């Protein structure tokens, strides 16, 4: 008699995806972030659902409803801070997951990689709209500034912005639709993540050596279920410690003031996880040019499979590419720092140099490094 997990239609799908899945025997801790992203999504959907039960998406009561959640709802403060800091955890895991993909050449699975880029865009859109909901000063002005960027699009820009706003400024209509989209998008992300997994399981996982591992596979369960569980325990312990000891560390103090259209904050800036893109946007004096650079800073990821010139897939044995990769990581830290600084010397020139370096490493230096390594390593 066949065991149930191999015969039952639903259990069979779970079995093929998480139990009997043939997995390379040598994948490292860098492969834990996929499961951790799934955990983040579950945490965000669960905490968000409870917040939505008490939140009101009206300009007059939105700010008060968030205060009410923190003061009057049982453990409302905890749910709110888990949700707010959960977004930061989500992006930390996302960026590490993407970095792993770049370092070990996982982008060669084109379908999986491109769906991953779509997931990144969806997550960024969700996070942006969620930031608007508490209706504090930075929520309001962040929404105004970022949506206004669309007015740089020729011909249709201004009409498009008013269409998104639902009026002539960010107001009740904007807040209501942002709440609706913020609620539905995580479920779309979950569905897209399933497609991401589907394509990944068509090819099987990559591994640190970047070589085919068909001759050396082990079942996902129990080996990687327990390895993932260790990652989950470490991340949850760190995350809860952070939420309970430093809940406001990553937030903006301006967001504790109710939205006021008549008073502009001195420095309008997004959450820390968007600062690198914000720095690239600001480094170009032209509005349309800045918007194009902003979009390209993420879209450039789609070019990685096309710009791969090395004969080896992974960077594990490619010292020049390794150096460039870590330079790129350092550059992203610099851009993140610059994005949080005011637009004045010396920050302007540092941001411009860092932006040029970001695109140069990806589009020029890494492909050249691949060709040099082919020659030098006689591969």
Curated annotation (Swiss-Prot):
Cofactor: heme b
Gene Ontology cellular component terms for the protein in this record: mitochondrial inner membrane; respiratory chain complex III
Keyword Transmembrane recorded: yes
Effect of residue 368 to V: In strain: Isolate LVT 3645
Textual note on the cofactor: Binds 2 heme b groups non-covalently.
KW Transmembrane (keyword) present: yes
Effect of residue 365 to L: In strain: Isolate LVT 3645
Principal subcellular localization: mitochondrion
Annotated positions binding a ubiquinone: 201
Keywords associated with the record: Electron transport, Heme, Iron, Membrane, Metal-binding, Mitochondrion, Mitochondrion inner membrane, Respiratory chain, Transmembrane, Transmembrane helix, Transport, Ubiquinone
InterPro entries named in the record: Cyt_b/b6_C, Cyt_b/b6_C_sf, Cyt_b/b6_N, Cytb/b6-like_sf, Cytochrome_b, Cytochrome_b_C_euk/bac, Cytochrome_b_N_euk/bac, Di-haem_cyt_TM
Localization terms from the record: Mitochondrion inner membrane
Domain of life of the organism encoding this protein: Eukaryota
Membrane topology category: Multi-pass membrane protein
Residues where heme b b562 binds: 83, 182
GO biological process entries: mitochondrial electron transport, ubiquinol to cytochrome c
Record-level Gene Ontology MF annotations: metal ion binding; ubiquinol-cytochrome-c reductase activity
Binding site residues for heme b b566: 97, 196
Pfam families, A to Z: Cytochrom_B_C, Cytochrome_B
Subunit structure: The cytochrome bc1 complex contains 11 subunits: 3 respiratory subunits (MT-CYB, CYC1 and UQCRFS1), 2 core proteins (UQCRC1 and UQCRC2) and 6 low-molecular weight proteins (UQCRH/QCR6, UQCRB/QCR7, UQCRQ/QCR8, UQCR10/QCR9, UQCR11/QCR10 and a cleavage product of UQCRFS1). This cytochrome bc1 complex then forms a dimer.
Similarity field: Belongs to the cytochrome b family.
Record function comment: Component of the ubiquinol-cytochrome c reductase complex (complex III or cytochrome b-c1 complex) that is part of the mitochondrial respiratory chain. The b-c1 complex mediates electron transfer from ubiquinol to cytochrome c. Contributes to the generation of a proton gradient across the mitochondrial membrane that is then used for ATP synthesis.
Note in the entry: Heme 1 (or BL or b562) is low-potential and absorbs at about 562 nm, and heme 2 (or BH or b566) is high-potential and absorbs at about 566 nm.
PANTHER family with a match to the protein in the record: CYTOCHROME B (PTHR19271:SF16)
Protein's name according to its UniProt entry: Cytochrome b
Source species of the chain: Chaetodipus arenarius (Little desert pocket mouse)
Gene: MT-CYB
């Amino acid at each position: 008699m066949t065991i149930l997990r191999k015969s039952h239609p639903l259990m069979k799908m779970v079995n093929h995806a998480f139990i009997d899945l043939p997995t390379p025997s040598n994948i490292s801790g860098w492969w834990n972030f996929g499961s951790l992203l799934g955990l983040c999504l579950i945490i965000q959907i669960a905490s968000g659902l409870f917040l939505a039960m008490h939140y009101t998406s009206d300009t007059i009561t939105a700010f008060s409803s968030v205060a009410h959640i923190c003061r009057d709802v049982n453990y409302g403060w905890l749910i709110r801070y888990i949700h707010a800091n959960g977004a930061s955890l989500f992006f930390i895991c996302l960026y590490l997951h993407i970095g792993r993909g770049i370092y070990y050449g996982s982008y060669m699975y084109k379908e999986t990689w491109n769906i991953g880029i779509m997931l990144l865009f969806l997550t960024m859109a969700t996070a942006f709209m969620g930031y608007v909901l508490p209706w504090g000063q930075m929520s309001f002005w962040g929404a105004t500034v970022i949506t206004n960027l669309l007015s740089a699009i020729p011909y249709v820009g201004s009409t498009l912005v008013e269409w998104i706003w639902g009026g002539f400024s960010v107001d009740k209509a904007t807040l209501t639709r942002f709440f609706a989209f913020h609620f539905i998008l995580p479920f779309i992300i979950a569905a897209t993540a399933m497609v991401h997994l589907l394509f990944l399981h068509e090819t099987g996982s990559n591994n640190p050596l970047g070589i085919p591992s068909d001759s050396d596979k082990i079942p996902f369960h129990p080996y990687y279920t327990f390895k993932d569980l260790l990652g989950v325990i470490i991340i949850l312990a760190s995350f809860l410690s952070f939420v309970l000891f430093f809940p406001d560390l990553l937030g903006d103090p301006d967001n504790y003031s109710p939205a006021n259209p008549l008073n502009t904050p001195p420095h309008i800036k997004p959450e820390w996880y968007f600062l690198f893109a914000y720095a690239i946007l600001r480094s170009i004096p032209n509005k349309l040019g800045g918007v194009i650079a902003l979009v390209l800073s993420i879209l450039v990821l789609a070019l990685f499979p096309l710009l791969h010139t090395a004969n080896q897939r992974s960077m594990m044995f490619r010292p020049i590419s390794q150096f460039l990769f870590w330079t790129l990581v350092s550059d992203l830290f610099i851009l993140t720092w610059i994005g949080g600084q005011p637009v004045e010397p010396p920050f302007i020139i540092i941001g411009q140099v860092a932006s040029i370096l970001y695109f140069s490493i990806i589009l020029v230096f890494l492909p050249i490094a691949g060709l040099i390594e082919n020659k030098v390593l006689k591969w």
